[in-house]
């Protein structure tokens, strides 16, 4: 076999971060570690023009809006690093704050990094280098 099932990681940014959190909270321990950068965690916190184009309103599609990482926080399996820029105007930092609170209430361990005054791209100065090093070091530690 070419894949060590005990050393599988997943990571994503923005909607990829949403997919990472959903995949790690599916109830099966497929991923040993994951990183979510600037993830939407509840569609009610996202841009209504974009969200309602695909999902309609929360009243019209309550089941669709209920399918989100916050609702599944108690099922999180694997080590998690979540990162977000405090000035993100695309995926509001409230997404990560609310998800982190759900993890705390579910008694789940996780790590989080916030980047002050950084937008959705988390760049500028040494910021992107720091972020990528944090992601690499997290996987090196968790997937050894």
Model-based region annotation:
Residues 1-144:
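Active-site-proximal cap/loop segments of hydrolase catalytic domains
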